C-alpha cells in the first residue's frame, strides 16, 4: 500500500477514535505518492502520529531520487542530477495548516525519544521527521548533524519558552 499509509491511518483513527495511531513512512513514500495524504492528514488535524524517515532517497528502489533529494543529486534515476528543489517537510506540514512538527537525527536516541513523546502527548496531527543515513545509496547525506560533534556545531534545539542557542 505504497503511499497510502496516512490515508489508512486516518481511516483507522476515525473508525476507532480511542485508538493511538502511529504511521511510519519514508520520505519518498510519504511525500511523493503519499504527498496528498500527508497534506490532508495535517489539514484535518486528527489525533494521528506520523513518523517520516528521511534519507533523501528511495532506498528500496535501489537509489532513485526522492522528493527530499537535493538539487543536482546524481542517482540512477537522475544521472545528470535532479533539476527540482527538494520538499522541505516542515514547510509542507505547516503549509497544510499542521500544528506539530519535530525533527531528530536517528543517531541521537535521547532526542528522538523526546520528539516521539512530545508527538504522543500532542492532541492533533503530529509529524516527526527522523533524519537517517542510507549507507548503500546515499551515504553521508546528513553528515552535518549525524555525529555528536556535528550536532553540537550545526543543530538548533528548540524548547518551548526557552531561548534558541546557535552553535556550541
Q: What is the predicted function of each stretch?
A:
Residues 1-59:
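Thiamine diphosphate
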Residues 134-168:
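Flexible, low-complexity linker and terminal segments
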Residues 41, 66-70, 144-147:
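Short, hinge-like loop/turn segments at secondary-structure boundaries
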Residues 55-57, 108, 131-136:
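Glycine-rich beta-alpha junction loops
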Residues 18, 66-119:
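Conserved thiamine diphosphate
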Residues 121-122, 126:
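Accessory alpha-helical/coil subdomains and C-terminal extensions
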Residues 34-35, 62-63, 104-105, 112-116, ...:
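A short secondary-structure junction signal
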Residues 23-25, 100-105, 127:
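Short catalytic-loop micro-motif centered on adjacent basic/acidic residues
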